[in-house]
From Swiss-Prot:
GO CC annotations on file: cytoplasm
Gene Ontology MF term list: adenylosuccinate synthase activity; AMP binding; GMP binding; GTP binding; magnesium ion binding
Protein name per the record: Adenylosuccinate synthetase
Residues where substrate binds: V296, S297, T298, G299, R300, K301, R302
Protein task: Plays an important role in the de novo pathway and in the salvage pathway of purine nucleotide biosynthesis. Catalyzes the first committed step in the biosynthesis of AMP from IMP.
The record's free-text note on cofactor binding: Binds 1 Mg(2+) ion per subunit.
Species whose genome carries this gene: Sordaria macrospora (strain ATCC MYA-333 / DSM 997 / K(L3346) / K-hell)
Length: 430
């Protein structure tokens, strides 16, 4: 039976920590989509591990890990990340990771094109990680991409990669700094190294579900970066919500037990795009500093602002969360008052809008309606149970819960693994 962990905002909500906490009960930990643009850190036994492409279930020595079919797979990063985990003391990682043979390959060519496309866009650039994710999904959808299983057919692999490179060379000319023959030569070695990890993920997941294995699925990025439901075009190139999980892992929807939405107690975003509750004044800077808001993948500072419950309600409508994990509540410890967005308002008519519009022009024209809640002005990291929290912190939790209509079962109160209050545990199916 499956538990799915999904980001409910624009990413960086703290999904990795919950994955780490739930992973000891899982037999398989899987990723469905995205690429090595995702990033999160996990602290286990006093050691910090960074994950980008690999599932964080590798921290659990008793857990198998799977990279699903909708992931765009950067082969050098795969081996580099495994080596770094070994250097930090994780053992047997090579025997606990499998890769779907249906994954598309994210080449260095795609990263080169990613940078050039951002330059083309100028002031309208997306703010990508520059790791080739968008171009990889573009070639996938254009049916010109290379899948993992094709790496093992040398003739097909080389022909398709040269065709890709030639197509981009025609578009960008000498601006494209890329040697296709060098990449082909590198893959002669990767072809041999990658073979033991490659699996038919459809059969693998079918057998696991038939046997009743406990499967933990960690979403990458977040709903508001979804190619269909996010703030398009300021999104990633994959389906980051529940639909992408089902497609990317061929998971049986009837065997999903829990869909846990992870939501930060405030809001952050990396890169360009709309962010209605962004605070460019003192509060935003304070959130950024106290929350250490800069990216694991890029090192870029995150834009910061107040919690947007319009976004969370929209995200919930799409992903159908059965429970929420509210993270980084402790970052709000020193705020006298805390603002929460409860609606948007048309400044022309004064009419309140409780939905999240698709049209970014309409979104930009709307004002935010805030509700102010009292802060608690005391540290909460040492709180171990829900009723250890100050009443103002509990009121904040309960306001969110009632507004969205989903139980908040996990509350993050600090950076460590043990800084997590479990509440309403009966809402989580074991």
């Amino acid at each position: 039976m499956a538990t799915i962990i999904l980001g409910s905002q624009w990413g960086d909500e703290g999904k990795g920590k919950l994955t780490d906490i739930l992973c000891p009960k899982a037999q398989i930990c899987a990723r469905a989509a995205g690429g090595h643009n995702a990033g999160h850190s996990i602290v286990a036994n006093g050691v910090e591990y960074d994950f980008h492409l690999l599932p964080s279930g590798l921290v659990n020595p008793n857990c198998m890990n799977l990279i699903g079919s909708s992931v765009v797979f950067h082969v050098p990063s795969f081996f580099s990340e495994l080596s770094k985990l070994e250097e930090k003391g994780l053992t047997d990682v090579h025997n606990r990771i499998l890769v779907s043979d249906r994954c598309h390959v994210d080449f260095d060519l795609h990263a080169a094109v990613d940078g050039l496309e951002e330059v083309e866009l100028g002031d309208r650039k997306i703010g990508t990680t520059g790791r080739g994710i968008g171009p990889s999904y573009s070639t996938k959808m254009a049916r010109s991409g290379v899948r993992i299983h094709e790496i093992f057919n040398e003739e097909i692999f080389e022909r398709k990669l040269r065709q890709l490179a030639n197509g981009y060379k025609k578009r960008f000319g000498d601006l494209l700094k890329y040697d296709v023959e060098e990449e082909i030569a590198r893959f002669k070695e990767y072809r041999v190294k990658l073979a033991p990890y490659t699996v038919d993920a459809v059969q693998y997941m079918k057998q696991a579900q038939d046997r009743g294995y406990k499967i933990l699925i960690e979403g990458a990025n977040a709903l508001m970066l979804d190619i269909d439901y996010g703030t398009y075009p300021y999104v990633t190139s994959s389906n980051t919500g529940l639909g992408g999980i089902i497609t990317g892992l061929s998971i049986n929807p009837t065997k999903i037990d829990n869909i846990i939405g992870v939501v930060k107690a405030y809001t952050t975003r990396v890169g360009g795009g709309p962010f209605k509750t962004e605070d460019l004044e003192e509060a935003g800077t304070k959130l950024q500093d106290i929350g250490r808001e800069w990216g694991v993948s890029t090192g870029r500072k995150r834009r910061c602002g107040w919690l947007d419950l319009v976004v969370l309600k929209y995200s919930t409508a799409i992903n159908n969360y059965t429970a929420l994990n509210l993270t980084k509540l402790d970052i709000l410890d020193t705020f006298e008052t805390i603002k929460v967005a409860v609606a948007y308002k048309d400044p022309q008519t004064g009419e309140e809008v409780e939905y999240f519009p698709a049209d970014l022009g309409i979104l930009d024209s709307l004002e935010v309606v805030y509700k102010e809640l009292p802060g608690w002005n005391k540290p909460i990291t040492d709180c171990k149970t829900y009723y250890d929290l100050p009443k103002e912190a509990r009121a904040y939790v309960e306001f969110i819960e009632e507004f969205v209509g989903v139980p908040i079962c996990y509350i993050g109160t600090g950076p460590k693994r043990e800084d997590m209050i479990v509440r309403k545990a009966s809402a989580i199916k074991e």
